[in-house]
Curated annotation (Swiss-Prot):
Family statement: Belongs to the UPF0145 family.
PANTHER family documented for this protein: UPF0145 PROTEIN SCO3412, UPF0145 PROTEIN YBJQ
Gene3D superfamilies, A to Z: Hypothetical protein apc22750. Chain B
Cited Pfam families: YbjQ_1
Taxonomic source organism: Methanoregula boonei (strain DSM 21154 / JCM 14090 / 6A8)
Name of the protein in question: UPF0145 protein Mboo_1021
InterPro entries hit by this protein: UPF0145_dom_sf, UPF0145_YbjQ-like
Length: 120
């Protein structure tokens, strides 16, 4: 059911009207980088450039946080989440926290003329 949740970073959903605002929704994950990744990344950082192990870990964490956000929104009865943002922080030097958050809403397609794009 969470696969059907529409997720956007904008405060509105073009072509849809918000019929109900359900409130704040989020998805959180905390992951340990692990000793092996820390050693590999530490060696790679000596040469400079991108640390692929951490990039992969953060991409996976962002996706998991987004999946959890959608699951939480679905339990609230939402079919969309607007204003989605991400935040991340490091905890204890070995763990990374990724938070996805937004506003759970119920939307329905607008009928008639196309909606103007609102900026700002």
């Amino acid at each position: 059911m969470s696969d059907e949740i529409i997720v956007v970073s904008t405060p509105y959903l073009p072509g849809h009207k918000i019929t109900k605002t359900l409130g704040f929704t989020w998805g959180l994950i905390v992951r340990s980088r692990g000793l092996g990744r820390n050693i590999t990344a530490g060696l790679r950082s000596l040469a400079g450039g991108e640390i692929h192990e951490y990039t992969q870990l953060l991409n996976q964490s962002r996706q998991e946080a987004l999946d959890r956000l959608k699951e939480h929104a679905a339990t609230m009865g939402a079919n969309a989440v607007i204003g989605v943002s991400f935040d991340s922080s490091e905890t204890g030097g070995v763990m990374t926290e990724v938070l996805a958050y937004g506003t759970a809403v119920v939307v329905e397609p607008e009928t008639g003329a196309a909606s103007p794009v609102r900026l700002g």
